[in-house]
Amino acid sequence: MLEDEYQLDFFKNNGFVRKQCQKCGTFFWTRDPERNTCGDAPCDPYSFIGSPVFSREFNISEMREYYLSFFEARGHTRINRYPVVARWRDDIYLTIASIADFQPFVTSGQVPPPANPLTISQPCIRLNDLDSVGRSGRHLTNFEMMAHHAFNRRDNEIYWKEHTLELCDELLNSLKVNPLAVTYKEEPWAGGGNAGPCVEVIVHGLELATLVFMDLKTDKKGDIEIKGETYSKMDNYIVDTGYGLERFVWASRGSPTIYDALFPGIVNELMGLAGIEHELNDSEYANILAQNARLAGFMDVSEKANLMELRKKVASSIGMTVDKLSAIMEPVEKVYAITDHTRCLTFMLGDGIIPSNVKAGYLARLVLRRTLRMMKDLDIRIPLSEIVDMHIKNMPEYPGFRENFPVIQDILESEEEKFNTTMERGRRIIQKSASHFKKTGEKIPLSQLTELYDSHGIPPEMAKEVAAEIGVGVEFPDNFYSIIGELHNKAEEKEEEVNPYAERLKHLPKTKRRFYDEPTRLEFEAVVLDVFDNHVVLDNTFFYAEGGGQPADIGTIVAEDTVYRVVDVQVYEGVILHTIENPGKELAITKGELITGKVDEKRRMTLARHHTATHIVNDAARKVLGKHIWQAGAQKFEDHSRLDLSHYKHISPEEIRQIELLANRTVMENKRVVTEWMPRTEAEQVYGFGLYQGGVPPGEKIRIVKVGDDVEACGGTHCTSTGIIGPIKILKTERIQDGVERIEFAAGTAAVRAMQKLESLLVDSSKTLSVPPEHLPVSVDRFFGEWKDLKKENERLKEELARSRVYRMLGDASEVSGLKVITEQVSGADSLELQKIATELLKTENVVALLASDFEGVKIVASAGEKAMKCGVNAGNLVREMSKIVGGGGGGKPALAMGGGTDPTRIQDALTRGLELVKTAACKEA
């Protein structure tokens, strides 16, 4: 459908011919009339290995600078890179391409670009090819996309397809690339809600660049279909190019793999630690590795590609068995993958991602644990942080990583401990799961394998090993990690909020929010635009509508001397609804009427204090805990607020004290709270993406709030200066999920009340112990020590009592077919006491004990000695039947079981029933 898009003067005027690849069927453009394939792997092998493509070698820094300078000299503005965690997006977690920096606001035309045209070298992370990393010789999880972008409008074109191709060809010519070796492959592109024609730039089997001409947007009613989605034309159209920095370096060096080109020192170090460096010096091994490298393009593990079949292709081409090739290549490929993954982790953690079980943190842990698993396979016994440190030493252009290394190191050590714990308990979990499938004769399915990984962190390789010991197979696809990465790569699509009043409100203008202009004003006049049910719409308002974790204002509306209480305020597509406390009759308010509104001052100020304090506590936490701290959620109430922070371990009491001290210092400095509306692009350039701690607001302009050193895009109400907040008191902290710590605090009068409450508890405790408050710690320690001693003595006496009871019970036991049967109600005994007695009685092999107690309902315990069990007595069956009589249930093992119920009046009936069952089950032999 896009075929006409490629009929360009650039191709016609520069000696290109359009051909169709004889292997994959794709159309491409070439200057070589003899060429019949598209040039891309696997249609063509890598022919640049050992034969570099460019006239000189480049390292990463040199290549990046060459590219950016090339485009700067041709009218492009160089801009700084964005983080690899997409803080400005709510639809994806990671920056997957340079164009992601500008989606959705710039690409949609809502916001101007930071420069036009521009050039950038953007670090990216993609995990959809995770299983090909290390194997194909070219795949990376973390790569830099060098790019130049032009943002065109129908009335203002910067440049389009012709000039983009001219620039690409000029760049390759400047690097002395043989023009006959270059192919431009036609391939439609789609991503991030946009699409368009695309040209892939191939040289000697390697895709060096992708030139996308984005002029389509997703549209359910669109008439253009690409990859199963329908699209329509955009008002603007964008040049979206991506040149692979690492691939350019590889092509310049002709190394066996991209990993050898980028990280030769780290690869050699890991080869040595894995004990395979000596093999690389062997001429036969070196020859096999070289041949494998040229054919590694086959090793693209995808949903349709089977790893063993791909390996067979390469083995056949080399002329050796697949088993021998696998034995040689798998350790080497794992070293390559570890090298790649650790650089990926350097960017992830360096840019502030905290490993966890959700969102970007899940993806970081996915890469991290896959790395640890491969290190375990190769018996590489160094901390993960040592390899990350090697990468940081090679990246002086990222000084923030070195500055943040202590935190990165701490995170990695913590994650290694968690991984080792998972491995220890994982074996039992797998054995249980495998036993279930062994009974059914089935393999452990992919769904269960995914569940084991997602819920318990158990790697599929481990599941396969343990299941094999039990004789159970596992459905373990070669692209398992790619599947997992793809499942968790995108944010969950938010359900579109249904506007129940859409029809009613669609013709009304947006309500003017005057509380932004005059934050201290609480009384105002407004014109009524609409009234329905118990809702009122005004032309302007000082009532804050609920949003951003802040509850709505309340107050009153006065109309014709009637006072109406406003109990809720909500906003729907810019129109604010004021909800009146149910009047029980139709509101006597009419359209066009002038009303007086009054906001409840106490609630407004309390919430403003807590909202402003949230900014301060967040900033203090970042200063104390590290720059990785990111707001994961916040909610303000009248009596307290809570702030959720991304953090990799529990916040210590000392850290809490430091955070509280810093927060109150900011309050006492009485700094002015500054608010201003700024163009989004300008705000991002000035303040960075920390602006979006509380979420990403829409619009070309965003409201910036500066509280002390904290600067955020925020739409809430705030104090005009920090001194108005009053004291800030942290009430408690807790871990609400892996990787997220919650701080609860109070501000202003609420903080004073909280401190008074704590003081009352202190005074009451002092009175109880008859000591002054300052002596409480010593007294509590003393009483606690005495309590522990008494508890031990109590346990000793209980055991002694149990033994004496055992002797008496044995003397009172009934004889049943050579067995001694004890049936007794032990008043007031809990389950543990009954269990101790029953366990003691187990030492006598011909004893059956049936014990019951009226403690908290009914407790029942039964035990059967070895001889009793041989005679057919089963304690589990006895407890099950006895528990039914007292209105409960229970069970256990043949030797010892526990149960109970709710009806203590039937205890004797239960004991009698137990005795009958013993008589029925017991052997007749003495």
Curated annotation (Swiss-Prot):
Record's keyword annotation contains Nucleus: no
EC number, UniProt record: 6.1.1.7
Entry domain remark: Consists of three domains; the N-terminal catalytic domain, the editing domain and the C-terminal C-Ala domain. The editing domain removes incorrectly charged amino acids, while the C-Ala domain, along with tRNA(Ala), serves as a bridge to cooperatively bring together the editing and aminoacylation centers thus stimulating deacylation of misacylated tRNAs.
Protein species of origin: Methanosarcina mazei (strain ATCC BAA-159 / DSM 3647 / Goe1 / Go1 / JCM 11833 / OCM 88)
The protein's role, per its UniProt record: Catalyzes the attachment of alanine to tRNA(Ala) in a two-step reaction: alanine is first activated by ATP to form Ala-AMP and then transferred to the acceptor end of tRNA(Ala). Also edits incorrectly charged Ser-tRNA(Ala) and Gly-tRNA(Ala) via its editing domain.
Subcellular location: Cytoplasm
Entry's family note: Belongs to the class-II aminoacyl-tRNA synthetase family.
Cofactor note: Binds 1 zinc ion per subunit.
Catalytic reaction equation(s): tRNA(Ala) + L-alanine + ATP = L-alanyl-tRNA(Ala) + AMP + diphosphate
Molecular function (Gene Ontology), one example: zinc ion binding
Cellular component terms per the entry's GO annotation: cytoplasm
Pfam family, one: tRNA-synt_2c
Cofactor(s) the record lists: Zn(2+)
NCBIfam families: A-tRNA_syn_arch, alaS
Binding site for Zn(2+): H611, H615, C714, H718
The protein, known as: Alanine--tRNA ligase
GO BP term (any one): alanyl-tRNA aminoacylation
Keyword terms, alphabetized: Aminoacyl-tRNA synthetase, ATP-binding, Cytoplasm, Ligase, Metal-binding, Nucleotide-binding, Protein biosynthesis, RNA-binding, tRNA-binding, Zinc
Keyword Nucleotide-binding: yes
